[in-house]
Amino acid sequence: MRHYEIVLLVHPDQSDQVVGMVERYISQIKEADGQIHRLEDWGRRQLAYPINKIHKAHYILMNVECGQSTLDELEELFRYNDAIIRNLIIRREHAITEESLLAKSAEEKRARKAQREEAQQVAQEAE
């Protein structure tokens, strides 16, 4: 089995259905004895350029290990799912399990925000 990195851009109106879609794809991979090494939900983000007059999309990143037949099935599911406006599948040499830079920066941003809020609370209590 080979390792692949999959990025999906989901229509922003379908953001609430992303969890169900991802679960369906994960079950498809696991039924074929594949593995999910990394799954990240990047949320809604601005597109670099409009796609079909859409300016934002919900981003999903998956690193999977599966066979070619499973990958072909996934590609077909992506192609015929109207909610997915773009997909990218890249073959990787090995499994990537660490967080992506985008996920790390989001965590750092949340940590800074929490520190800032904590500092504000301490300052308010001191007054």
Curated annotation (Swiss-Prot):
* Record InterPro entries: Ribosomal_bS6 (IPR000529), Ribosomal_bS6_CS (IPR020815), Ribosomal_bS6_sf (IPR035980), Ribosomal_S6_plastid/chlpt (IPR020814), Transl_elong_EF1B/ribsomal_bS6 (IPR014717)
Please give the name of this protein. Small ribosomal subunit protein bS6
* Disulphide-bonded residues: none
The record's Pfam families line, in alphabetical order, gives: Ribosomal_S6
Q: Which family does it belong to?
A: Belongs to the bacterial ribosomal protein bS6 family.
What's a GO biological-process term for it?
translation
Instruction: Identify the keywords attached in UniProt to this record, alphabetized.
Output: Ribonucleoprotein, Ribosomal protein, RNA-binding, rRNA-binding
Q: Which NCBIfam families match?
A: S6
